[in-house]
């Protein structure tokens, strides 16, 4: 993510995820603008934020263990997370 040696992710799963106490599903955040990416604005953050213009790739979803998360940059509004999760579901064939 820019000059940093980490990539931010947005958690898109909830407590119904198997082993939710150990891991969750995350969508990748990037500084690369793409037509299908979800732009994050200051209004999308409930707290915190990112230092550069950022976009979520809802087609790049990975399972990450909580122990592997270094720190939180902020938290997104529920409506923003729901929008990202809904778009991610579309890439999985859920309509």
Residue ranges and their predicted role:
Residues 1-95:
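Conserved functional hotspots at enzyme active or ligand-binding sites that engage polyanionic ligands
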């Amino acid at each position: 993510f820019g000059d940093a040696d980490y990539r931010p992710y947005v958690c898109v799963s909830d407590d119904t995820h198997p082993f939710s106490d150990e891991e969750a599903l995350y969508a990748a955040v990037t500084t690369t603008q793409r037509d299908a990416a979800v732009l994050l604005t200051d209004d999308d953050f409930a707290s915190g934020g990112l230092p550069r213009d950022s976009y979520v790739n809802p087609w790049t979803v990975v399972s990450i263990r909580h122990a592997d998360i270094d720190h939180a940059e902020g938290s997104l509004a529920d409506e923003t997370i729901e929008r990202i999760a809904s778009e991610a579901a579309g890439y999985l064939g859920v309509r």
